[in-house]
Amino acid sequence: MIIAVDGPAASGKGTLAAGLARHFRLPHLDTGLLYRAVGLAVKDHVGAQDFELRAIAAARKLDAGHLTAGEELTTAGAGVLASQVAVIAEVREAMRQYQRDFAHQPGGAVLDGRDIGTVICPDADVKLFIKADSAARAERRARQLESRGVAVDRAALHAQILERDARDRGNPNGAFYPAPDAHLLDTTQLDIEAALRAAVAIVDEVNARKAKP
C-alpha cells in the first residue's frame, strides 16, 4: 500500500505521515530531507567549478544512511544548501527516481512532501492532502523550533510561511494543488492525536471500499 501525504509548509503532514507509517507498519520517507542530504554531502564544494557535477553524483548515490544525519538535516544551513542543489535538473530527476523507488518497494510505503500524489506517485493507493490556516502553521513551526532551543520571531516566521505559500500557488504541481482524488484533511483545529485518528480513518475507509467485490 502506497500512502501519499501532501500539503503546504508546517501543515503537519510530516508528523501525520510518520504516525500513519507506525500504525500501518510501513516505511516512511520525509521527502523534504532528500535535497538537504544532497546539499550537506557537497557543502565543502559550494562555489567550486565542479559543484554541479558533485551534486549530481551525490544525488545519484543517495541512500537511506544519508537521511539519518540527525538535527543537521533540519538546520537553516541545510535548507540553504538544499535550495542550491534543487535548481540542478539532474539532481531533481535523481530525487524523483529515489522517491518512486522507495514508494514501490515490496509492501509499499508512506511518503510526505509537496507533490507526492500529483507527480511522484499518481498511482498511490491513498492520497491525503493536509491543510491548515497560515497562523496555525506558523505557530506549530514556532513551537517546533523553540523545542530545539531556537529563538523565534513569530511575526517573521508567519511572513515567511505566507511568502512560501505565494510561491507555491504559482506552481500547478505545488503544495497548494491536491491531486483530484486526494482526501482533504484540515488540521487547523486538530491536535496531532485527533488528526492521526482522522487520517487512519480515511485510509481504512479507502481500503474497505477497495475490498468490496
Feature map (PLM): residue ranges:
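Post-Walker A helix-loop "phosphate-sensing" segment adjacent to the P-loop in P-loop NTPases
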Residues: 21-31
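P-loop (Walker A) phosphate-binding loop of NTP-binding proteins
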Residues: 8
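Phosphate-binding beta-loop-alpha motif at adenosine-nucleotide cofactor sites
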Residues: 126, 131, 176-192
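ATP-dependent small-molecule kinase phosphotransfer cores
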Residues: 34-108, 118, 135-139, 143, ...
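Hydrophobic anchor at the beta1->P-loop junction of P-loop NTPases
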Residues: 3-5
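C-terminal alpha-helix
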Residues: 198-209
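Hydrophobic positions on the alpha1 helix immediately C-terminal to the Walker A/P-loop
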Residues: 16
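Conserved lysine of the Walker
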Residues: 13
